[in-house]
From Swiss-Prot:
One of its GO terms (biological process) is cytoplasmic translational termination. InterPro entries: Ribosome_recyc_fac, Ribosome_recyc_fac_dom, RRF_sf. It is found in: Cytoplasm. GO terms for cellular component: cytosol. Pfam families: RRF. This is Ribosome-recycling factor. Coiled coil: none annotated. Responsible for the release of ribosomes from messenger RNA at the termination of protein biosynthesis. May increase the efficiency of translation by recycling ribosomes from one round of translation to another. Belongs to the RRF family. One of its GO terms (molecular function) is ribosomal large subunit binding.
Length: 185
């Protein structure tokens, strides 16, 4: 019963950290990344279609993304979709391929992005702590119902705290790595 609680707690915390890692891939760092275009949708024959389902996306240089639509007639719509996504990128087209140059970030913008990343990481720490609280509440109700003793409750809460500390450290590591990537010139 307690082991199931540990497993559920750990599983929920793993999901939180994975979600954070996925969110961090979307943060612009001054380097080109395929994930920068993840949210781009293109009006393709009246249907909003994800860009990655209608074009080849490549990164030929560290500050450039190329987008080659499979249907050349849709190139103008792809450009509009990138602009409408409002991700701070400006596409330029030669009629066959779209090139997106990633402008270098200013020092102020880098600090601003780092601050946003820090706030996001703090939100995920709160989420992990809420999972801990849920687990501790479950343990308290088990003790109240007489399913576990006070000693078992104390040991289990300590184990839940250890699991929480482990995941908080993972979140801090994700933040440190992303901050280094952002502030690096």
């Amino acid at each position: 019963m307690i082991n199931e609680l540990y497993k559920e707690t750990r599983d929920r915390m793993v999901k939180s950290v994975k979600t954070l890692e996925k969110e961090m891939t979307r943060v612009r760092t001054g380097r080109a990344s395929m994930t920068m275009l993840d949210g781009v949708k293109v009006d393709y024959y009246g249907t909003l279609t994800p860009l990655n389902q209608m074009a080849s996306i490549a990164i030929p240089e560290s500050r450039m993304i190329t987008v080659q639509p499979w249907d050349i007639s849709a190139i103008k719509e792809v450009e509009k979709g990138i602009l409408k996504a409002n991700i701070g990128l400006t596409p330029s087209s030669d009629g066959k391929i779209i090139r997106i140059t990633i402008p270098p970030l200013t020092e102020d913008r880098r600090r601003e992005i780092a601050k946003t990343v820090h706030n996001t990481c703090e939100e995920f720490k709160v989420a992990v702590r809420n999972i801990r609280r849920d687990s501790n509440d479950t343990l308290k109700s088990l003790q109240k119902d007489g399913d576990i003793s006070e000693d078992e409750n104390f040991k289990a809460q300590k184990e839940v705290q250890d699991i929480t500390d482990e995941f908080i450290k993972q979140i801090e590591a994700v933040f440190a790595a992303k901050e280094k990537e952002i502030l690096e010139l």
